Each structure stands twice: as C-alpha cells, then as structure tokens.
Amino acid sequence: MAAKIRRDDEVIVLTGKDKGKRGKVKNVLSSGKIIVEGINLVKKHQKPVPALNQPGGIVEKEAALQISNVALFNSATGKADRVGFRFEDGKKVRFFKSNSETIK
C-alpha cells in the first residue's frame, strides 16, 4: 500500500500538546507512527557511556507520533489537507484533495 505521508513531507499536527505546529517528517515507522523535527519533544535521562566518551544527562529528543494525528500541509492553501492517489503518465502520484495539485 502506498504511503500518504513520506519522509521530508511538511506536516501539521492535528491533536495533542503540539497542535497546530508544523515540521518536516524525519522518519516513518512501520508501526503507523512518524517522527517529526521539533515536535513531541521528550526529555530522556541518559547514562554516561565512558567507552564511547558519551556524557550522561538529560537529553531532549523527538518522540514518535501516531500518523493519524498529523496531516500533510498544503503550502498553496496554508492549511492541512487530505491526500489522494491518481495515475499520471502511467505513474501513481499523490495529490491534494482540496485543489487537485500534485505533490512533488
């Protein structure tokens, strides 16, 4: 099945503490979750690793979000938008449902 949201897409968060924030997709996980740059930041307590010369401490990093809690951001309309699929020149492409613009 083709993915509606892919790596490097710009998405907007629909629900949760980061509602309304936009970010770029860093990673799409097979469990139906995604990691977005600068969104859903959590503090992780990390032990030092002397063998790798890594200091310990509290590190802030991005946690995964459910893919259903984000939508693709349409820069033409400035809003979140739904994604559809169609065939153009024998290739399956994604498009925004509001204005039928093809997604690059």
From Swiss-Prot:
Record key words, sorted: Ribonucleoprotein, Ribosomal protein, RNA-binding, rRNA-binding
Any one Gene Ontology cellular component term annotated for this protein: ribosome
Alphabetized GO MF terms: rRNA binding; structural constituent of ribosome
Annotated SUPFAM superfamilies: Translation proteins SH3-like domain
Repeat in keyword set: no
Any Pfam family: ribosomal_L24
InterPro entries: KOW (IPR005824), Rib_uL2_dom2 (IPR014722), Ribosomal_uL24 (IPR003256), Ribosomal_uL24_CS (IPR005825), Ribosomal_uL24_KOW (IPR041988), Translation_prot_SH3-like_sf (IPR008991)
Quaternary structure annotation from Swiss-Prot or TrEMBL: Part of the 50S ribosomal subunit.
Family: Belongs to the universal ribosomal protein uL24 family.
Function: One of two assembly initiator proteins, it binds directly to the 5'-end of the 23S rRNA, where it nucleates assembly of the 50S subunit. One of the proteins that surrounds the polypeptide exit tunnel on the outside of the subunit.
Protein name: Large ribosomal subunit protein uL24
Organism field: Erwinia tasmaniensis (strain DSM 17950 / CFBP 7177 / CIP 109463 / NCPPB 4357 / Et1/99)
